[in-house]
Regions:
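Gly/Thr-rich phosphate-binding beta-strand-loop-beta motif of the actin/hexokinase/Hsp70
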Residues: 1-25, 118, 124-153, 205, ...
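Short acidic/polar active-site loop segments enriched in Thr and Asp
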Residues: 11, 71, 281
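N-terminal capping/interface segment
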Residues: 13, 66-67
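N-terminal glycine-rich anion-binding loops that anchor highly charged ligand groups
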Residues: 24-32, 67-68
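Helical "lid/coupling" subdomains associated with nucleotide-phosphate turnover
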Residues: 40-64, 78-90, 96-120, 124-126, ...
Length: 302
């Protein structure tokens, strides 16, 4: 059967079509719209403009799915709508105008779906999974392919960019402010205090962008998905706006992460703090995550 999945995130709204046959599925195509819903949250309230952007994008996806007679559609939303004070009202407004039922998944559920999707085809049985989203960061530790701890932190690449960064790229002072909040938030996650030297499986746009920049800057193959954590601070330093960024670095940034120019450095700051907090030396990027985990758990698992 053909199954449409719509993931309404804080930074992007993604739609993918999967062919599901028995216990296996294949992604046939995907689309992405960089909407930046988290930037429409003012004083904790999702603004009408954000609702309008979500409606426009979902109606576009709905027309596409209808064209190919894909009637099975599941939509879910994460931090931007989940954490808004008017979450229920905003979701109901979007549902009413689009005819698409939206499931608001909790931070705990998001972390679980991340884990299921990202680790299904990986060889390492134990480690640390991190998903730095636009409005939240999910962390899961696992051993023998079983979840040990999981949490969702209220920090993300777009929320940091909106809160701290005045222009497109941050200044050194803005980087320090983001670093301080990331450290304080992560330090409060006491369940993880004893974990160290765990290899990180990273999912989401921040880690995808980190690998692209790492490969470009360190002359590695474009297909490489492994990143030494010691390189992250060096990568950040190349793109701080008041440290004399060169034209060569501007070209590298635009070539590697054209759709994440304003969020990649805030996301990398969170990644840097996490990797040092857990004394991790390596990150492996996985392009499977919450959508694939949702299929395994909510569609194939039922």
């Amino acid at each position: 059967m053909l199954q449409g999945i719509i993931d309404i995130g804080s930074n992007t709204i993604r739609m993918a079509v999967y062919l599901i046959e028995g216990n296996h599925f294949e992604q046939l195509m995907k689309r992405k719209a960089t909407v930046g819903l988290a930037s429409y949250v003012k004083e904790g309230v999702m603004q009408p403009e954000g609702i309008e952007r979500a409606v426009e994008t979902l109606l576009e996806y709905k027309r596409f799915l209808h064209c190919f007679k894909i009637n099975r559609v599941a939509a879910f939303t994460t931090a931007a709508l989940r954490n808004a004070k008017n979450s229920r009202e905003a979701v109901e407004a979007i549902e009413e105008r689009t005819g698409i039922k939206i499931q608001v998944i909790s931070g705990d559920e998001e972390a679980t779906f991340d884990f299921i999707g990202a680790t299904h085809n990986l060889q390492n049985d134990s480690g640390l999974l991190i998903d730095i989203g636009g409005g939240s960061t999910e962390i899961v530790t696992y051993r023998d392919r079983q979840i040990q701890y999981k949490t969702s932190l209220p920090i993300g690449s777009l929320s940091f960019a909106s809160k701290y960064v005045k222009d497109v790229l941050p200044t050194m002072q803005e980087c320090m402010e983001m670093h301080g909040e990331a450290e304080a938030t992560i330090a409060a996650a006491s369940d993880f205090i004893s974990i160290s030297e765990a290899e990180i499986v990273g999912i989401g746009g921040t880690f995808k962008g980190a690998c692209a920049l790492n490969n470009e800057l360190f002359n590695l193959p474009a297909a490489n998905r492994r990143l030494e954590t010691k390189n992250i601070r060096s990568i950040i330093g190349n793109f701080v706006s008041d440290l004399g960024m060169t034209q060569e670095m501007s070209i590298t940034l635009m070539r590697s992460v054209p759709e994440r120019l304003n969020t990649i450095i805030p996301g990398l700051i969170i990644a840097s703090v996490l990797s040092r907090r857990f004394q991790s030396h390596w990150i492996t990027y996985s392009d499977s995550g919450v959508r694939e985990g949702y299929i395994y758990d909510q569609i194939m698992g039922k």
